[in-house]
Amino acid sequence: MIVSFSTVYFFIYLLLFVSIGLTSSLFIVPLLGASFAFASGVVIFGFLSNVTFKSAQTIYIKVDKRLKFILAKMSSFTNGNESEKNVDVPLLQQTKKRHSQIQSKLKNSFNTNINNNNLTNNDNIVTSTTRGIDVPLDTNNSVTSAIARSLETRADSKIATN
């Protein structure tokens, strides 16, 4: 039996083709499996992300509706006329009187400042520069400073408790 060169070359090429195919499959099959695992992970995490987003959106909508309902209820309970009736009348008169005293002090101090171009600082009066003019402010007795002091004490107590 005589074998021709073409038959020998055929078997050599067949052997090379099969060996290269097996070698490449050793790399391709595990990497293909890893790729499949990662693709499955992406799909699963995408699904979980969508589920959590939808549930968070539902919770947000429910809480938003509940808060709107609570705020509407609270606004129906508070009436502008009722809050004025609850104000302590002597305290209100005292505050108005003190406010007019402060305004008169400010006018007097402002006029003397313009005339003398020099303002004396008392213990109760602090100067504030507004547009280049010194304006005295009574920081110890005004209603605004009382509010500011109450806010400062609240802030100080919060800092102290933390």
From Swiss-Prot:
Transmembrane segments: 2-22, 27-47
GO biological process, one term: lipid droplet organization
Localization (cell): Membrane
Keyword tags: Membrane, Sporulation, Transmembrane, Transmembrane helix
Residue intervals annotated with topology Cytoplasmic: 1, 48-162
Single GO MF descriptor: protein-containing complex binding
Membrane topology recorded in Swiss-Prot or TrEMBL: Multi-pass membrane protein
Extracellular side: 23-26
Transmembrane helix in keyword set: yes
Annotated GO CC locations: lipid droplet; membrane
Pfam families, per database record: Osw5
Job of this protein: Involved in spore wall assembly.
Family note: Belongs to the OSW5 family.
Protein name per its UniProtKB record: Outer spore wall protein 5
